[in-house]
From Swiss-Prot:
PANTHER family: FLAGELLIN B1. It comes from the Archaea. This is Flagellin A. Disulfide bonds: none annotated. Belongs to the archaeal flagellin family. GO terms for molecular function: structural molecule activity. The gene is flaA. It is found in: Archaeal flagellum. N-linked glycans consist of the 779 Da trisaccharide beta-ManNAc(Thr)-(1-4)-beta-GlcNAc3NAcA-(1-3)-beta-GlcNAc. Keywords: Archaeal flagellum, Glycoprotein. Flagellin is the subunit protein which polymerizes to form the filaments of archaeal flagella. Residues 1-12 form a propeptide.
Length: 219
């Protein structure tokens, strides 16, 4: 009788032990699944974020659609570059945009830029009289560029924050006296927005300047 009772108790203990092991296995599996789900979610979020950043890098930037020079015999001493965001681009802050030309880097400091080199007045582009973008007729510092707003329907392009978005258009003004842009000069460089791609350009100036025209369209 005692042997039978002992065997029944042993079977009961074994059953409880098996149940405990089973519950432990279920808990471990649940924890592992939770970790996998969380890791998967993190990786998916990371991939999505990386994809968005990559898209911005590829699509964001400036499109140049005309570059003109003001002739002051025997050289071109002022340049204008018409820019707009490229198709699909996010808004571009011109304050944080760099322009490299023939080994020169032009970058407007935020303070002097906001007070001196901004013009929200669509008039004659090369009219320096009273134009802040041309330093009010004085020589524009060689290592700064100005901005003239051409089109800005939403008012996003201001002196303090010269941001251009879809449909906006602006002109970058440059003093290039010391670049010695005589006929047949090769002019190359790039525009680099804070985020996005470089807009590279190369121009070969005409063999001779037409003295009857004071504005030269670079090609």
């Amino acid at each position: 009788m005692k042997v039978k009772e002992f065997m029944n108790n042993k079977k009961g203990a074994t059953g409880v032990g098996t149940l405990i092991v089973f519950i432990a296995m279920v808990l471990v599996a649940a924890v592992a699944a939770s970790v996998l789900i969380n890791t998967s979610g993190f990786l998916q979020q990371k991939a999505s974020s990386t994809g968005t950043e990559s898209t911005e890098q590829v699509s964001t930037g400036l499109k140049m659609f005309q570059t003109s020079g003001k002739l002051n015999e025997p050289i071109i001493d002022r340049l204008t570059i018409y820019v707009t965001p490229s198709p699909g681009s996010k808004p571009v802050d011109l304050k944080n945009t760099k322009l490299l030309m023939n080994r020169w880097t032009f970058q407007p400091p935020p303070v002097s830029y906001s007070s001196t080199y901004f013009e929200n007045n669509n008039k004659q582009i090369f009219d320096v009289t009273g134009s802040k973008a041309w330093n009010n007729g004085a020589i524009l510092p060689e290592y700064n560029f100005g901005v003239i707003v051409i089109q800005d329907d939403d008012g996003s392009c201001t002196a303090e924050s010269p941001v251009i978005g879809k449909g906006d258009m602006a002109v970058i003004t440059i003093n290039c006296t010391n670049l010695d842009l005589a006929p047949r000069t090769r002019l190359n460089g790039y525009l680099q927005s804070e985020i996005g791609f470089k807009t590279q350009f190369t121009y070969i100036l005409p063999n001779a300047y037409d003295k009857t025209e004071d504005v030269v369209i670079l090609q």
